[in-house]
């Protein structure tokens, strides 16, 4: 399952490499950051082995705790969802 993180800026004091590394730690064996483009990170969640909702919740929690801006969204199945909703 593909999930996209749309953001306008990174949290203060974090580089893109920091965020990618931390997300890969959060996802552990349930997914991986697999690319992206300007202001977007692409994640591949392993829906065959684990309920993808757990990984989605872990990503959302990480983004909140890392201090991503209020307008950051997760795109899942073509729908964008705010991380603070």
Predicted segments with their positions:
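Short glycine-/aliphatic-rich beta-strand segments at the starts of folded cytosolic domains
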Residues: 1-13
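Broad gene-expression machinery/nucleic-acid interaction feature
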Residues: 2, 40-42, 71
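A structural detector for beta-sheet-dominated domains
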Residues: 6-8, 44-46, 77
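Short amphipathic alpha-helix segments
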Residues: 10-31
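Structural alpha-beta junctions
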Residues: 25-34, 64-70
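Short, intrinsically disordered low-complexity segments
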Residues: 30-62
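Short, solvent-exposed polar/charged micro-motifs at secondary-structure junctions
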Residues: 42-45, 81-85
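Conserved short beta-strand edge segments in small beta-sheet-based binding/regulatory domains
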Residues: 60-84
């Amino acid at each position: 399952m593909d999930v996209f993180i749309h953001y306008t800026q990174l949290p203060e004091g974090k580089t893109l490499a920091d965020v990618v590394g931390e997300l890969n730690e959060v996802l552990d064996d349930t997914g991986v950051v697999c690319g992206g483009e300007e202001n977007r990170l692409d994640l591949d969640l392993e829906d065959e082995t684990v309920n993808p909702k757990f990984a989605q919740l872990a990503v959302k929690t990480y983004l909140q705790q890392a201090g991503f801006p209020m307008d950051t969204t997760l795109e899942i199945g073509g729908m964008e969802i705010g991380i603070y909703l």
